[in-house]
Amino acid sequence: METDRDHMEEDLGQVAGVSDRGQRHSRNEDAMHFAVADNDDGPVVVAIVCDGVSSAPRPHDASWTAVQAGITLLAEGAGQGDDPREVSLGAVRAAGQALTELAGPDGAPATTWVSAVVSQREITVAWLGDSRAYWLAASPARPVGPNDTMDITGGSRRVSRDDSLAEEIVAAGLASMDEALASPQAHVITRWLGADMPDPEAHVEQFSPAGRGVLMLCSDGLWNYRPEAAELASMAMPAALTRPLDAASYLAKFANDSGGLDNITVVIIPFPPRSDAVPASPAE
């Protein structure tokens, strides 16, 4: 059984996270879990963030059950050096099966899902719903001349793409993102993890960063206030590279100070994972 979830912090050195109830909700329906595995190449970080679907029954149970069911498979696969794509999809299926077993007369609990496997050379992200993964580059690129059009975000970007009505409207060419987000139905998700979603196959993206940075997983309680990767990078850096808990705490506080209209979860994973990284404070 989980402990009090109104405010949770955890720091493993190579990864840290904060999950908070926010200002408006009576309980925290988000959940996070992460671990560090070791294989022949060095430490591998695995992490999951889930946001229980409030319109379904027992959303707090759904998110917690999903992260608990998925993290063991992620950690075991990473430690054995298994294909991270297959490991990620297997974890999603295990979480989906666990949620199927939660279904009852009151309906089918459901949750979003975003997970990561972060090794020394590669990052694998899997997702369903609108919980997000961002790559935040360590420093912005610098233009070399007045006419240079170099991307000054330095490669910071959103890795995941929401399974939401807003994204579908934009993809269909029916509206701009700003116009789509103005709709009261913008945040309606179109795919999720639960017994009533017949196709739980997650999206997967793999990439190899060219330099240092952090992978951030978060629920919409944060990105509703700062959706752009470059802005998030400017807020998180440089603390996120060596003090991930400080960065996660700062971003969670920012979301709370901005209104805290939803539950807030932020997980920060510096890349590449360092074997000498230690928690900011002794574990409880």
Residue ranges and their predicted role:
Residues 1-284:
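PP2C/PPM-type serine/threonine phosphatase catalytic domain
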